[in-house]
Swiss-Prot record:
It holds the Pfam family ParBc. Involved in chromosome partition. Localize to both poles of the predivisional cell following completion of DNA replication. Binds to the DNA origin of replication. This is Probable chromosome-partitioning protein ParB. GO terms for biological process: chromosome segregation; positive regulation of sporulation resulting in formation of a cellular spore. The keyword DNA-binding applies. InterPro entries: Chromosome_partition/occlusion (IPR050336), HTH_ParB/Spo0J (IPR041468), ParB/RepB/Spo0J (IPR004437), ParB/Sulfiredoxin_dom (IPR003115), ParB/Sulfiredoxin_sf (IPR036086), ParB_dimer_C (IPR057240). PANTHER family: CHROMOSOME-PARTITIONING PROTEIN PARB-RELATED (PTHR33375:SF1). The keyword DNA-binding applies. One of its GO terms (cellular component) is chromosome. Belongs to the ParB family. The lineage of its organism: Bacteria, Pseudomonadati, Pseudomonadota, Betaproteobacteria, Neisseriales. Keywords: Chromosome partition, DNA-binding. GO terms for molecular function: DNA binding.
Amino acid sequence: MAKVKGGLGRGLDSLLANGADNSSGDRLTTVAVKDIRPGRYQARVQIDDEALQELADSIKAQGVIQPVIVREHGLSRYELIAGERRWRAAQIAGLTEIPAVIKTISDETALAMGLIENLQRENLNPIEEAQGLKRLADEFGLTHETIAQAVGKSRSAISNSLRLLSLPEPVQEMLYQRRLEMGHARALLTLPVVEQLELAQKAVKNGWSVREVERRSQAALQNKRPEPKKTAAADIGRLNDLLTEKLGVNAEIKTANHKKGKIILHFDTPETFDHILKQLGIDYRP
């Protein structure tokens, strides 16, 4: 990657505007698919094969609606700046040419445009997104606020995303593979590093929800086991009262270890027995 010179600390608008040698010289044309090489400045690393095939099918039916963005790279060759999924899907669809906007821009502007184009899409995995945001912050000295405005997210969302890169590498890999969600990761970040991996592995193995991981993270911070969820069997006395009130007869619930048990309904006259059957919705006529 070319070293960025003179770009640090500049606002994003200034970066994109000043990075073009001649923005008015942009050309919309068609370019041979084989003459385009992947961009050096892409946030995306992983592309879902199934989603790519769906896009290829759409391109077969409707063509490429939105041009890719490229810049010249050698004689009759082009480097991709934005639109990698469209370019790859076009190859799968068997297209020989693709609509493209040819720009004359610097390395740093190519990086910014490529990152922002990908970050504005929602199908990056959380780690790819965090890595792209970090490059914008590190290589251009942009604040979280400036990055947030550029990609259409809140400043806190940018900060939370960047924090993912402090997780242990195995946990980052789980996020990369989408075995964990962003919500799981936020809960893990509250724990010491040693405990993050252990809880992440258990979450993946057991298929825990975000809420469950949050609960266990909070319990770990309090240095105690998670409190068991309340069940109906945990409040037998209250249930006795409710059942008695509902049926209008003396009800008794007996359990063994709050797992198995029986319900006893007491009656002392035939009329009371008939009343119980009626309350239970049983229409019995001997």
